[in-house]
Amino acid sequence: MATATSKAKPSDRIKMRIRKGDTVQVIAGKDKGKTGEVLRTLPNENRLIVEGVNMRTRHEKPTQEGETGRIVNEEASLHASNVMLYSTAKKVASRVEIVVEKDGSKKRKLKKTGEVLD
């Protein structure tokens, strides 16, 4: 099994249908029910970073003389299986399906609402 610092093996990777800028809802873990925008995806690790979710506190030492140390709150990554795409219009989380248009282009569509994302 892959750790957070190593890359997932090709057999362990999941299809990430979530992209940067999407709104997602956390469906498992300590932040269950929270929604936020995806800031970054890490497809090699099956993880993503969501704005305002899974916050971690990091302590920084002073780097120069006369400077004081700081406490920084930042988002930690979540596993992609712990989030679902979220419809802001209908206020509901949904699975996503890939729809092939007549011109051959692929679009992402929410299954519950029918909302097309791309």
Swiss-Prot record:
Family named by the database record: Belongs to the universal ribosomal protein uL24 family.
Alphabetical list of SMART domains matching this protein: KOW (SM00739)
The protein, known as: Large ribosomal subunit protein uL24
InterPro entries with a match to the protein in the record: KOW (IPR005824), Rib_uL2_dom2 (IPR014722), Ribosomal_uL24 (IPR003256), Ribosomal_uL24_CS (IPR005825), Ribosomal_uL24_KOW (IPR041988), Translation_prot_SH3-like_sf (IPR008991)
Chain coiled-coil ranges: none
GO annotation, biological process: translation
Lineage start: Bacteria, Bacillati, Cyanobacteriota, Cyanophyceae, Synechococcales
GO cellular component: ribonucleoprotein complex; ribosome
PROSITE patterns xrefs: RIBOSOMAL_L24 (PS01108)
